[in-house]
Amino acid sequence: MGKTIVIKCGGSVLSDLSPSFFTSLQEMYAQGMNIVLVHGGGPEIGQMLKRLNVPSEFVNGLRKTTKEVLEVAEMVLAGKVNKQLVALLRQHGLPAVGVSGVDACLLQAAPIDLAKLGYVGEVVNVNADFVHQLLKSRYIPIISPIGADKDGQKYNINADTAAGAVAKAIKAAQLLFVTDVPGILRNGSIVEQATIDVIERMMNEGIITGGMIPKVKAAIAALSESLHEVMIVSGKTPFYENGQLHGTTIRNEVGVY
């Protein structure tokens, strides 16, 4: 099989994905790459909770997930957002399969802190064989981050950490975090590569601010012995052209600033 790329699309960028995003996917697929998409859906979940008058709150940046909130989260993530993405890829001639982390025990989860966060989970195991079977058949798995434990209890999982867990488990060559900007910007120019210490310095100096902070933190957290680099890319402009990825590469090794 060809090189495997995991792409994480946050809920906030899903509605802004441009035709060039899908053109990049088409080019990667045509070149024999294996593509896995992991998506979020925070804004959509928030809107649905409000519409259904289901109370919710955030604790340390994570949505406290009661049984009622979990039902809505699963409905939105697995039922709505996932299938919208499958349909979008189909429109662009790409064979996608939408799955939840519950399917085939894809994302086995355990509670992070049941008392404080409710049914918010962390990934303790990934069914890599299932993903590889889909990739071998040249499907593009689109994964919604709802997992379950061995007893079938479901959990809402942060999409960033789910994407990192999947990338590590299937030994992906690259993990891309899709944002609304073409990468980390410094004085209006893209920082093409940086190391963890450089990223931390840029945060301290106020070069990386706002919504980019959790994105780079998630990217850093995904780095491991098997995953040496991750990228911040744009969903609004081509992120892959002529065999080249465009964005900011974050790696463990020595980079530039």
Curated annotation (Swiss-Prot):
Its EC number is 2.7.2.8. It is found in: Cytoplasm. One of its GO terms (biological process) is L-arginine biosynthetic process. It catalyses: N-acetyl-L-glutamate + ATP = N-acetyl-L-glutamyl 5-phosphate + ADP. The keyword Kinase applies. The record marks K8, K215 as: Transition state stabilizer. Substrate binds at G41, G42, R63, N156. Keywords: Amino-acid biosynthesis, Arginine biosynthesis, ATP-binding, Cytoplasm, Kinase, Nucleotide-binding, Transferase. GO terms for molecular function: acetylglutamate kinase activity; ATP binding. It comes from the Bacteria. One of its GO terms (cellular component) is cytoplasm. Catalyzes the ATP-dependent phosphorylation of N-acetyl-L-glutamate. HAMAP family: ArgB. This is Acetylglutamate kinase.
